[in-house]
C-alpha cells in the first residue's frame, strides 16, 4: 500500500512537513531522539485506520517510512511518554491496550479492563482520551459523550496499569465541543497539567488548551480554558517533547484551495515553568515592569493574569536591556510605542479585547481579538520590523489566551 507522501521544507527556525491533503490524516504524536524526529500519523485506507511511522534527520530528509498496523475506524490511538519511554495506547471495544514503540510489540496487559464496569449503567461513549503519569500514578483524562450529547471531562486514576481505575474528578460538561473533538494530548511538568485538543464547528477547526493545577491527593483544579487557534482551518495541534524535557506545540495547517497539508515544526524549542508556548516557540512575556505606572515588578510573575478594560486608558510597559516598550489603550485605539516612538496604532472601537503577548528572545508577538476580527502582529525589538495579520473568522470570536494565576 502506498504510504502518505511527505517532504520537508525549511525556513529559518521552522520546518514544514508537507503531506497529502487528506482530511482523514490524524497526527498521533511525535518525539525527538538525538537529531532524529519521529512522527506517527493515521489515515483512513479502505475503511481501516492505518498507523504510519516516519523518521526525519535534522528536519531535512525523510530517512524511514513504515506502515505499522491497521485498526478499526472507531479506535482511538495515542502516543504517550511514561518516565521517558514511549508507548502507543489504543482504545478499542471499550478497552485500553498498550504497545511499545520500538520495537512495535503488543504488551501483555490491558490498561483498563472495562470502563463500563466502573459504576456506569451503560458503556461510556469515549470521544477521546489522554494519559499522563505523576508520582507513580497513571491518570486517564477522558472526553465522554453523555446522554444529552454533551462532552464531559473525567479523570481516572490507577496506581498500576492492571489495577482498576477509579474516577477521581468529573468536571461535568464544560461546553467544549461543537461538532467533534480530536487530537487530545497532555503534558505534565512542575505541578501543572497542560491539555491540548481540537474541536470543529461548521468545518472550522479550533484548538483549545486547558491547564490544570495538580496537588497531592489527586486534586485537580482548572486554571485556564481558552482557544488557541489562529486560523479557522487549523487542526491537529499537539504536544511534542524534545531534548531535556523541552516542550513545543505543533499543528497541521490544512490550507484552503491547496492539494497539500502543512505540518509546522519549530526547530528551536524551549520551556520555562508556567509559560505556555505558541509556534514558533514564543513565550508569554514575563518582563512586565509596570501597568498604568504602578510597579508590579515585585508581585508579577509568569503566572499572573492581567485584566484590561478597553474603554479606559491603559498602558503596559516592559524593559529590554537599554530600551522600554509601551503598549497603550486610549480613545478606543491600541498602540505600541518604543523609546517614545509610536510604531503601530490600531482602531479597537468598543469591542471586547483579548490581549496576549508572547516573547522569544527579541521577537514579540501581540494578538488582539475584537468581535469577529482578530489582529496578530509580531516585531523584532532591535529593528522594529513587524508583520500584521488580520483574520476575519467567527470561529475565534471568543478567542482568549493568557497566563494564569498560581494562588
What residue spans do the PLM features occupy?
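Hydrophobic residues embedded in beta-strands of well-ordered beta-sheets
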Residues: 37, 49-51, 86, 96, ...
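Beta-propeller blade signature
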Residues: 53-56, 98-102, 152-160, 206-216, ...
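Beta-rich accessory regions
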Residues: 1-22, 28-32, 201-203, 208, ...
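Hydrophobic core segments of beta-strands in well-ordered, beta-rich domains
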Residues: 26-44, 78-93, 119-121, 126-148, ...
